[in-house]
A protein has these predicted regions:
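Alpha-helical cap/lid subdomain in secreted, periplasmic
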Residues: 1-143, 147, 151-165
Length: 165
């Protein structure tokens, strides 16, 4: 059976940041909440199976919460930045936790759906200079990050025959 990789680089880190900065005490939902995120993956798994393919999920890459915070607050006033930090509970680490929550949901979904998942997160975290794997926005893979992921995927594909020829 042919296998197909299901890769979605986004996590739940897409919010209306300007709206949050203007009203940090309000209720704010991500552009794609966790339920919709899992449903999107579940649909993609079902589509692959409907086409006679075996789906294989790929975990999310790492992110750098401090760089991402700087990126999403560029152009904001100091007060807006403080408001956003307030909404995050006073720590940019909350951004990493949200990202990790979405990534962990992929591993749970893989187990529930009985599909393989390729862990690209761990080799990135194991890198001595993981910050070099990301662009300045803290979430986009740099050329070095893309190379690490490509190497990891190639190794696993070769070793375990994850893609049929």
């Amino acid at each position: 059976m042919d296998k197909t990789l299901i890769i979605q680089p986004e996590s739940g880190l897409q919010y209306n940041w300007q709206e949050i900065a203007a009203n940090p005490s309000g209720q704010h939902e991500p552009v794609m909440d966790l339920v919709a995120y899992k449903a999107q993956y579940t649909n993609r798994i079902a589509q692959a199976r409907a086409h006679g393919q075996e789906p294989v999920l790929v975990s999310l890459p790492i992110m750098d919460e401090n760089r991402y915070f700087a990126f999403i607050t560029r152009g904001m006033s100091m007060q807006e930045r403080k408001n956003l930090l307030y909404w995050l509970g006073g720590k940019t680490e909350r951004l990493r936790n949200i990202h990790a929550l979405y990534n962990l949901s992929l591993f749970r979904l893989a187990a529930q759906q009985c599909v393989h998942i390729i862990d690209i997160t761990s080799p990135m975290l194991a890198s001595a200079h993981y910050e070099q794997l990301l662009e300045q926005d803290g979430v986009t893979l740099s050329a070095e990050g893309k190379q690490l992921v490509d190497n990891e995927l190639s190794t696993l594909i070769s070793r375990f025959g994850l893609l049929a020829s």
